[in-house]
From Swiss-Prot:
The keyword Manganese applies. This is 4-hydroxy-2-oxovalerate aldolase 2. Residues 16-268 form the Pyruvate carboxyltransferase domain. It is an enzyme of class 4 (lyase). PROSITE patterns: PYR_CT. The keyword Lyase applies.
Length: 358
């Protein structure tokens, strides 16, 4: 046993930047319904705990307010303008998915106080991002390339996509486990492949979901292979079974000697006293969110699938498995109802659907 332990990387003194997602990914779990005042309260509590980077937007990012992705209680500009001036040490970040968010919206976010942007693409589509990344760099923003659903590309393929993002100007490239599908070996292989092709000064990040309960283990695996940025969400507030629970991950970091600069007890208090009371439902690994991780389905699909299940009479778990089989990706939310309708039709349930609609 001692020989095995001696082979484990010593992470003492390793510096890692924590990036909280509860005010962006957490919007999915709240059906985008977080009031501006509550957004400010949470952000100020995170700032006081020492969290250095906090993401604040609609769940789908800039341009996310739409029929397909849901309408938030306020615009991204309203959220950012309220939160950014209140920050004493934390920087505010935003999510931008090319094709949804625009450069004009990025400029507006910058004007409202955002200083970091996560430019997110599917793991095989980095070539949709060069203009957005270049514009973010022109603005002087901390610019991150974010490769979503990373399990759908092998390590070598993901490394090529990450290299493209670096060439476009990204200062950090993320391995993004949008489905909570990956195991530590999967994460290690992809982070190592990126580290082998990126410049030494280009950082690597990891964004996990807790659908298989692997968020913390996967994040540590990423750090072992050279990642220096880790996303998480206080109390795990996020899509599916939530993101890597940030306060739990921080406790593990403190145990391992990983340096984050964040106060553990303050973050624990934020989770218990601020985030848990605002949850509409307990964010946990349940039957449907576990199915997301097992089948490799985009975590944001969870509540959409539950709504489709109620409408068409097909169990949400079975809808999610079919979405995984079809390899549906982020941005294809409109296909969830189509899939459920097709399944209902095959099972002779459409008469019941019309009766429910009436």
């Amino acid at each position: 046993m001692s020989a095995t332990r001696s082979m484990e990387p010593d992470l003492r003194g390793r510096k890692v930047l924590l990036h909280d997602m509860c005010l962006r990914d957490g919007m999915h779990a709240k059906r985008e319904q977080i009031p501006v005042e509550q957004m400010v309260k949470v952000a100020m509590a995170l700032d006081a705990a020492g969290v250095p980077l906090i993401q604040v937007t609609h769940g789908a990012g800039l341009g996310g307010n739409s029929l397909q992705h849901g309408f938030a209680l306020a615009s991204n500009e309203a959220y950012l303008s309220a939160v950014a001036p209140k920050m004493k040490q934390a920087k505010v970040s935003v999510l931008l998915i090319p094709g949804l968010g625009t450069m004009r919206e990025l400029q507006s976010a910058y004007n409202c106080g955002a200083r970091s942007v996560t430019v997110a693409t599917h793991c095989t589509e980095a070539d949709t991002a060069p203009q957005h990344i270049a514009y973010a760099r022109k603005l002087g923003m901390d610019t991150v390339g974010f490769l979503m659903m990373a399990h759908l590309n092998d390590p070598e393929g993901l490394a090529k996509q990450g290299k493209l993002m670096e060439d476009y100007g990204a200062q950090t490239v993320y391995v993004t486990d949008s489905a909570g599908y990956m195991l530590p070996a999967d994460v290690r292989a992809r982070v190592a492949a990126l580290r082998a092709v990126l410049k030494p000064e280009t950082e690597i990040g990891f964004h996990g979901h807790h659908n298989l309960g692997m968020g913390i283990a996967n994040s540590i695996a990423a750090i072992e292979e050279g990642a220096s940025r880790i996303d998480g969400s206080v109390a795990g507030l996020g899509a599916g079974a939530g993101n890597t629970p940030l306060e739990v991950f921080l406790a593990v970091c403190d145990r391992m000697g990983i340096e984050t600069g964040v106060d553990l007890f303050k973050l624990m208090d934020v989770a218990e006293d601020v985030i848990v009371p605002m949850m509409d439902h307990l964010v946990r690994v349940d039957r449907e969110s576990l199915t997301l991780g097992f089948a490799g389905v985009y975590s944001t699909f969870l509540l959409h699938a539950k709504r489709a299940a109620a409408r068409f009479g097909v169990p949400a778990r079975e809808i999610l498995v079919e979405l995984g089989r079809r390899k549906m990706i982020g941005g294809q939310e409109d296909m969830i109802e189509d899939t459920a309708m097709s399944m209902a039709k095959e099972r002779g349930l459409l008469k019941d659907v019309s009766r429910k609609a009436a």
